[in-house]
Amino acid sequence: MNNSYLMGLDFGTLSGRAVIVRASDGAEMGTAVHEYPHGVMDRTLSAADGRKLPPDFALQDPADYLGTLEVIVHKAVEDAGVDPGRGLDVTSATVVAATRNGTPLCQLPEFRNEPHAWVKLWKHHGAQDQADRIVKLAQERREPWLARYGGILSSEMLMPK
């Protein structure tokens, strides 16, 4: 019998994880976990000049994602001993500012020490003032779309960030 296998990838807050399962029955064949080298930068911009960050910031280095991807894919495949298919899951509230060609701004020398050029994690709440301003203006204008969000916007959403 010819088996098919699937690989699932999850990029969490502190680490990336991979799992390989047999498609026919979901049996786990191999796994891997790798912690991000720079972790979460919530006090200082430790991957750059070390400057102190404002309250409620939660940033990451996008290079950690690529390095982690390489590690966990190879380790999971080795652990399972199979050639997998691949699937990807990411958190929609994590934002990466990038150039037209996809280069994250924090990887450009002129933006390396700019906190807003780094990946803003789902738990980055540094945009609360902007979220409040957007809601206030939407209420004043009686914007119909605001009701779809329960009359509020989270600072974790793309628009305030």
Segments and roles (model prediction):
Residues N2-T31, E35, G85-A98:
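Gly/Thr-rich phosphate-binding beta-strand-loop-beta motif of the actin/hexokinase/Hsp70
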Residues L45-A48, P54-K161:
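Glycine-rich phosphate-binding/catalytic subdomain of phosphoryl-transfer
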Residues E28, Y36-L45:
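N-terminal glycine-rich anion-binding loops that anchor highly charged ligand groups
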Residues A23-D25, G39, H74, L137:
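Alpha-helix termini
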Residues R17, V40, G151-I152:
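Intrinsically disordered, low-complexity regions
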